[in-house]
Amino acid sequence: MSKHTKKWGSALLAAGIFAGVTAVPVSYIQAASTQQQQVTTQQPGITIQWNGKTLPAKGVQVNGSTMIPVAALRDSLGIPVSYDAKTATYTVGSGYNKLYIMASSSDAYVNVNGINTRSMDAKQIAGKLYIPMSLLKDYLGIDAQWNAAQKTVTLSKSQLNPITIVPQTLPASSNAKVSYKIKYPQISGSQLNPEAQQAINNVLKKHAEGILAAGKKIMAEGEATTERPYEFGNDFAIAYNKDGILSVIMQDYSYTGGAHGMTARKGYTFSLADGKLLQLSDVLKANPNYKKFLNADLKKKIDALQAGEGFGKFKELAADQNFYVTNSGVTIVFDLYDYAPYAYGIPEFTYSFGQLLPQGGKPFVGQI
């Protein structure tokens, strides 16, 4: 790991914004995606229903993933879709979450507000662009129910929390040697407890302030030049905004003159009722044995991922384990250099609530 990598990670930790999360390379994110995988199994057309009406467009199943045509989102659901010919990029959605899809004749790369995770995988099939149903559920405010027997997916608008989410920019002076582009979400709502609203906003703003403090600490060392100016910035995405729960992904970026930039990703999950920052134990309270299952399963997955390479062995979840919540379930986040090589990217593992909770059990018990 380079000197600048260590500086960035140390500065972030010193700023107190990452509860155990260190900086990781940005290459996985800047590629804006997971590589297009070869389509090995494609099922016949799938019926799509929107608010009870059958749409003319058809979905497809690829390797077990239900894929929805982007054209149907525009033409039938009324979701804004635009195209930038210069960058060959589609923008899907409006508001605080937008999908960006970079498409070529055979590949398609997708991110949400500049953030890519391993659950994102767009497809180009017979000249049409498709995105997985899970992206609609997790980031575009659309509920989706899959009926395997009828080969039908039913879409409807999600019942989101009655809050407003507005991006804010942290004032910072850029110059020829450094660029700061630091933003963070702030929430408001007439039904929110004012103290809870303030507590949540304070945590998110403090995260942004920590990025700026870390950048200024590095800049004070005087190594930046006009030929290779430094950069400090971030992106955020709203991963869950339902049931009185808000989960936010914050992703920070730095470039300090090395061969490549660096990123760090952190999840924050809040109860809107009181502003409490939730731990994994709060989300999965209905299953007192969740750690036993996750520790065993993660060890198996990480051991397979390492394939004998010399990285640290996974032992157990951290007391303040980094995670975020989506409609798809809970995503456990680790740092790149802990368990995997640079080329792998940020190791993340998503588990559905059905996997983590007993039958009939619900997440967020006592928090909503």
What do the PLM-derived regions correspond to, one by one?
Residues L13-F18:
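Hydrophobic helical h-region of N-terminal Sec-dependent signal peptides
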Residues K6-A11:
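Sec-dependent signal peptide recognition
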Residues A19-Y28:
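C-terminal segment of classical bacterial N-terminal signal peptides
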Residues S2-T5, S27-I368:
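Compositionally biased intrinsically disordered regions enriched in Thr/Gly
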